[in-house]
Structure formats: C-alpha cells, structure tokens
UniProtKB/Swiss-Prot annotation:
One of its GO terms (cellular component) is mitochondrial inner membrane. It catalyses: a ubiquinone + NADH + 5 H(+)(in) = a ubiquinol + NAD(+) + 4 H(+)(out). The gene is MT-ND6. It is found in: Mitochondrion inner membrane. This is NADH-ubiquinone oxidoreductase chain 6. The lineage of its organism: Eukaryota, Metazoa, Chordata, Craniata, Vertebrata. Core subunit of the mitochondrial membrane respiratory chain NADH dehydrogenase (Complex I) which catalyzes electron transfer from NADH through the respiratory chain, using ubiquinone as an electron acceptor. Essential for the catalytic activity and assembly of complex I. It comes from Ovis aries (Sheep).
Amino acid sequence: MMTYIVFILSIIFVMGFVGFSSKPSPIYGGLGLIVSGGVGCGIVLNFGGSFLGLMVFLIYLGGMMVVFGYTTAMATEQYPEVWVSNKVVLGTFITGLLMEFLMVYYVLKDKEVEIVFKFNGMGDWVIYDTGDSGFFSEEAMGIAALYSYGTWLVIVTGWSLLIGVVVIMEITRGN
C-alpha cells in the first residue's frame, strides 16, 4: 500500500513540475512549485525522513512563499493567462502529462523501474553503517554530519539564499 501512496505522490509531484514549467502566468508557476514542494515533503515523510521533511516544508514552503508572494504581487496581471488560453502552453502541458502517463504505464507493466538505476530494494540507500553497534537513525547521523563536517556547505547555502532573495527583489523592483 505504501508503494502505491509513493507512486501517486510521485505522479502529483511530476504533474506539479509540468504545471510550473509550462506556466503562462507567474501566479500559476508559484502554485505549481508550492504543490510540488508539499508533495515532495510528503514523499520524504513516507520514507521515514520526518526531520528532513519537516525542515524542507518549513524552510522551502515557509521562506520561499514570501519570495513567491512578493514576486507574484509585483508581476500581477489584470487578466492572467491560463493553461488553456495559449495553444503552445496547452500543448506543452498535455505533452508533459502524456509523458508522465506513459512512464506510469511502463512502470506498472514491468513492476519495477530499470531506466537508469534498478530500485527494487532499500538496501542500496544505506549511508552509514557502524558495524556491531545496532540500529541507528540515519537522520540523526546525517544532521550531525551536516553540521560538523558540512559547516561551510551550510554557510554557503545560507549566503546563496540571501543573495537570491536580494537579486529577486532588485529584479522585481523595477526602475
């Protein structure tokens, strides 16, 4: 049952990406990103990553919602274009959905995914093994490694997000 839940969430995830990649108006692009981000957090939660899913949900959908709201407010149109108002955008949206449904058919026909990697077990996803010490939470070890060995990565990521917000505000401010 969990496999089908992840499969359905993955379909919604890709449909959200198709929705914002074929966006005719910034409002719908932000909506597609919000849907995809929320569903992505649900997928991470389904695999047991409660801390990571919560952090992504709070940081991405909390922090970036401010940026989406600000840029959408600055780029509002009186009559926003929707997916069906332009034939090229509608064609792109339908083509993306068709590709997703063909992928779903291919996966359901063979009962596994073997396009680039073969995902038929979770044993390949083990990150850190401590030998005879028993069961450890991968999340706790990952967070400890991120903040101990990856300090510079956290600093560069925070700085990049700050610069990204400043650049977006300067672009949308106008003259």
